[in-house]
Every structure is written in structure tokens, then in C-alpha cells.
Amino acid sequence: GLTGSFWLALLGSLIGAAIAGVLIEIIIIRRLYRRDHLDQVLATFALILLLSEGVRWIFGAFPLYLNIPNILNGSIPLFFEIIYSKYRLFIILIGLLIAIGLYLLITKTRLGIRIRAGQNDRQMISALGVDISKLYTIVFAIGAGLAGLAGAMIGAIQSVEVGMGEPILILAFVVIVIGGIGSIKGAFIGSILVGVTDTIGRVFLPNLLKVFMEPANATSMGSSIGSMLIYILMALILIMKPSGLFGKN
């Protein structure tokens, strides 16, 4: 980058993604609100493909890397003699702060009240004088900005490249289905359940299977089964609660 500053990169990604989100919402998504949800989903998938190929054509497909700042480099001792990366702890902390901030925004502010009302009955809130289009644009900007921030933070662990968010897309849908559509609490609990289930499956299953088979086969099979556990969890929750853990009936 021009400055090499990690913190400016985070800020720039947040602002840049929010601006892009506003433009996409105004130009494309706003025209689809009165249509079926499937049309909206298909349109956003088409946008993913178009934007990915556009970025690849303009900037190339070479991955870019962010340097972790010195203050977040290295590891820190935790309980039970566990050594953990400072930067990963930083990501966890930022995630928790964002979750708390979103919860307070939705439940404790006038904007949050309008967002919830607009979700339930857009005609009613429009009749009360609230500009529902502006409200949706704000929501889209917040979501896009947070997505950009997340991409920048993960770029210091992996790399920033075209399609880096696509593997997360399916997991995001799983989190929403498990937690319940429209629930901030559900999204938070669902993301924790998915993360813990995936980690336990990938870490403990291979070690357990090594007791019964060759280490190489155990590692491969354990990782595969670990990935399946997320979808098994989703299926079980949907059987018991079709609307998700905190979704509306």
C-alpha cells in the first residue's frame, strides 16, 4: 500500500466496502425488494461472479498480504499452559465487540427500532413517515462495511485475493439457518456453534480415528467427517426447530 499501515488498511477496507455496498444497494438491490427472495439471492450470486471476474481482470489474480503490526505479533500464554496467537485473540475480541455493538444498535437505538419495524412491516413504517429506502441503504452499508473489515483482518492470516470470501459464504448461510433469520442473538450463537463444531471435528476426530486406522487415513477421514458435522448439526436443529434456534415461528 501507499503507507504500509495495517490500521489504515482496516479503516480503508471498512469505508471502501461500505461505499461499495451503498452503490450496489441503490443501483441493483433496491429494484428487487418487491420481488421474491430467491430473485434477490440469485442477483447477489450473479454480482459475486461479475465483481470477482472484474477484479481479476483489472488487478490480476495475484494474492496480496497484510503485515501484522508489531504489537500483535507473536503469542501470549493463556490458561492451562496454552500458547495462542495475539493476532487471533485480537480478531476474537473485535468480533465480540462488533456482536455487542450490533445487539445494542438493534435493541437500544431509534435506528434499531426502525430497522426491526421495517423488517416486519415496511408498508406500515413507510406510512409513518420513515424513508424505508434510506433505512435499507444504511443496513446494507453496515453489512458491507463489516464484511470488508473482516476480509482485511483475515488477510493478515491468509491472503487477500479474488474469491477469498466464497468458502465463507456457505458457512454464513448455515449460521443464519441455525440461528434463525432476523435474529442478532441467533447469528451470534449460530456462529459459535458452527465454529466450535468445525474445530472439534477437525482437531479431535483425526486423533480419535488414529486409534483404529493408519495416521494418514485418519487425518484425511477425520477432516472430511469434521466438515460434515456442521451440516449434520444444521439438519438436527432444523428437525427440532424449523425456524432456527431464535427464529420467529
Question: Which residue stretches match the model-derived regions?
Answer:
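Helix-loop interface residues and adjacent transmembrane-helix termini in multi-pass membrane transporters
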Residues: 3-4, 34-35, 108, 119, ...
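Transmembrane alpha-helical segments in multi-pass inner-membrane proteins
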Residues: 3-15, 137-147, 151-231
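Alpha-helical transmembrane segments within multi-pass membrane transporters and channels
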Residues: 4-47, 54, 189-194, 198, ...
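Transmembrane helix-bundle core of multi-pass membrane transporters
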Residues: 31-32, 37-108, 135, 203, ...
